[in-house]
């Protein structure tokens, strides 16, 4: 009996260890925003002032909660940064390209990690239903990365409650046209750095479709990773219970024959004692 209890406890502990990665995967992902965002000023200084970066964006509206705006903007920033990264990877004859490439690569990693932290599976219908809110424009580096920083700030504000808030648009939605907050006219000063000669951003249909597939693949890969962990843990749990049941069936029936044997032994002893007493009585009568 003690061996069976020990086996059950051992199986239970093993299941807790196997389910631990699943718990970690579902827990908070921490802070994906690193100090690499501080290099944005350097990157903007390196890019030509007239360089244009294409971005599909959603203007901020009073009827659109900030955390929902974040779900709409993050995938588009991932695509635009990926396209920008690809353009720098095609240039290899300038000394400052490696520095720019490294900065853009770090920013791409940040936005991808941020995208992994968002509950896209929970709000994917919201993103599909509000695709009409997007507008496409070409931004100079200063304005593009100002919008990027705005997205980062919104994430920091709602990081602890993103998985608890559902994105539901009210029945009446403002039209994003002529929104005063869309136009980015405020200027900020960046350190003067020699501008790299870089051709303007021209995203073709093939590049756009490839980047869309990669961004969607990134989202699906994170979801598939969680599903695979869950299935592995559940399968291990099932195997553990099956092994425990088999062990129980093998060990438990053995206790019954032993108990029967002990009962029979006790019966034999009683019969022997009775026969001995009867024999002594006979001997006593004969005397």
From Swiss-Prot:
| Disulphide-bridged cysteine pairs | 29-117, 68-167
**What is its membrane topology?**
Single-pass type I membrane protein
GO cellular component terms, semicolon-separated: cytoplasm; cytoskeleton; extracellular region; filopodium; lamellipodium; plasma membrane
Question: Quick check: keyword Cell membrane in the entry?
Answer: yes
Signal sequence, renumbered to the chain: 1-25
Question: Which parts of the chain span the membrane according to its record?
Answer: 226-246
Q: How is it modified after translation?
A: A soluble form is produced by proteolytic processing of the extracellular domain.
According to its UniProt entry, the protein's GO biological process terms are: cell adhesion; positive regulation of cell population proliferation
In which domain of life is the source organism classified? Eukaryota
Tell me the compartments it is located in: Cytoplasm; Cytoplasm, Cytoskeleton; Cell membrane; Cell projection, Lamellipodium
Q: Which residues are glycosylated?
A: 100, 149, 200
InterPro entries named among the record's database cross-references: 4_helix_cytokine-like_core, SCF
Keywords for the protein's UniProt record, in alphabetical order: Cell adhesion, Cell membrane, Cell projection, Cytoplasm, Cytoskeleton, Disulfide bond, Glycoprotein, Growth factor, Membrane, Secreted, Signal, Transmembrane, Transmembrane helix
SUPFAM superfamilies membership? 4-helical cytokines
Q: What ranges does the Cytoplasmic topological domain annotation cover?
A: 247-287
Query: Which intervals lie on the Extracellular side per UniProt?
Result: 26-225
Give one Pfam family: SCF
Question: What GO MF terms are annotated?
Answer: cytokine activity; growth factor activity; stem cell factor receptor binding
According to its UniProt entry, what is the function of this protein?
Ligand for the receptor-type protein-tyrosine kinase KIT. Plays an essential role in the regulation of cell survival and proliferation, hematopoiesis, stem cell maintenance, gametogenesis, mast cell development, migration and function, and in melanogenesis. KITLG/SCF binding can activate several signaling pathways. Acts synergistically with other cytokines, probably interleukins.
PANTHER family recorded for this chain?
Answer: KIT LIGAND (PTHR11574:SF0)
Q: Which family does it belong to?
A: Belongs to the SCF family.
What subunit structure does UniProt give?
Answer: Homodimer, non-covalently linked.
Record's protein name: Kit ligand
Its lineage opens with: Eukaryota, Metazoa, Chordata, Craniata, Vertebrata
């Amino acid at each position: 009996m003690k061996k069976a209890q020990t086996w059950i406890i051992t199986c239970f502990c093993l299941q807790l260890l196997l389910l631990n990665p699943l718990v970690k995967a579902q827990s908070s992902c921490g802070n994906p925003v690193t100090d690499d965002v501080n290099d944005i000023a350097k990157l903007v200084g390196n890019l030509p002032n007239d360089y244009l970066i294409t971005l599909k964006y959603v203007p901020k509206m009073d009827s659109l909660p900030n955390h929902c705006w974040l779900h709409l903007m993050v995938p588009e920033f991932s695509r635009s940064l990926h396209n920008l990264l690809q353009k720098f990877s095609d240039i290899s004859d300038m000394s400052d390209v490696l520095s720019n490439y490294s900065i853009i690569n770090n920013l791409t990693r940040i936005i991808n990690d941020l995208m992994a932290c968002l509950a896209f599976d929970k709000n994917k219908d919201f993103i599909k239903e509000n695709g009409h809110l997007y507008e496409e424009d070409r931004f100079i580096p200063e304005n593009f990365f100002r919008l990027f920083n705005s997205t980062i700030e919104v994430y920091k504000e709602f990081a602890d409650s993103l998985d608890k808030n559902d994105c539901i648009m009210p029945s009446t939605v403002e039209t994003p046209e002529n929104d005063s907050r869309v136009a980015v006219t405020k200027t900020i000063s960046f350190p003067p750095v020699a501008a790299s000669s870089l051709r303007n951003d021209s995203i073709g249909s093939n590049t756009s479709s490839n980047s869309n597939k990669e961004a969607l693949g990134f989202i699906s890969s994170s979801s598939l990773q969680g599903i695979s962990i869950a299935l592995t843990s559940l399968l291990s749990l099932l195997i553990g219970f099956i092994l425990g049941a088999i062990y129980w069936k093998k060990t438990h029936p053995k206790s019954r024959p032993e108990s029967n044997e002990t009962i029979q032994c006790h019966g034999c002893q009683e019969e022997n004692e009775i026969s001995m007493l009867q024999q002594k009585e006979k001997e006593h009568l004969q005397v």
